[in-house]
Amino acid sequence: MTKKNLKERLDKGPVICAEGFLFEIERRGYMSSGEFVPMVSLDHPEALENLHRDFQHAGSDIVQAFTYNGHREKMRVIGKEELLEPLNRSALQIAKKVALDTSEGIEPNLMAGNISNSNIWNDKDTSQNKEVEKMFSEMVGWAVDCLLYTSDAAD
């Protein structure tokens, strides 16, 4: 089946993107409250893949990579900044795998990246804002790599 892009799908009706990874992964026992860093993509990738499939089964048209809070600031706080890129790349690859893996005759899901808020952005003190921009730019860069430089790129 030919895969339609987002605009084509929206022209035909609503497009659903399931959300709620953070609290559902915590509820399932794969994340502790506190900093809420998505280490599950490295520590238990099968659990993250299963959650994506559950959302897909529930009707989500878009598989959203669980990279929320997977940025340099949060990784620094938990002392795992060196795992930043592997965490993001793993989460993106898992989402892409699930998005493209559908039953025969079923249109593949779209895939999306995800960034979160930052606790260091301050519109009154711009000294940290370049760091925030860089932090999110690198996440977007890894998502672009995942989409463009691997086979069967999702939209």
Briefly describe each language-model feature range:
Residues 6-42, 68-75, 104-132:
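N-terminal small/glycine-rich loop or linker at the start of catalytic domains
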Residues 19, 55, 95:
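Conserved, mostly hydrophobic/aromatic
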Residues 36-43, 56, 62-84, 151:
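Glycine-rich, proline-tolerant flexible connector loops at the mouths of alpha/beta enzymes
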Residues 48, 88-92, 132-136:
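Aromatic/hydrophobic pocket-lining residues that form the small-molecule binding cavity
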Residues 58-59, 94-109, 142-148:
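A structural motif corresponding to the C-terminal end of an alpha-helix
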Residues 80-102:
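Alpha-helix-loop-beta-strand connector modules within alpha/beta enzyme cores
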Residues 126-148:
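Alpha/beta enzyme core
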Residues 149-155:
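Conserved small/polar residues in nucleotide/adenosyl-binding loops
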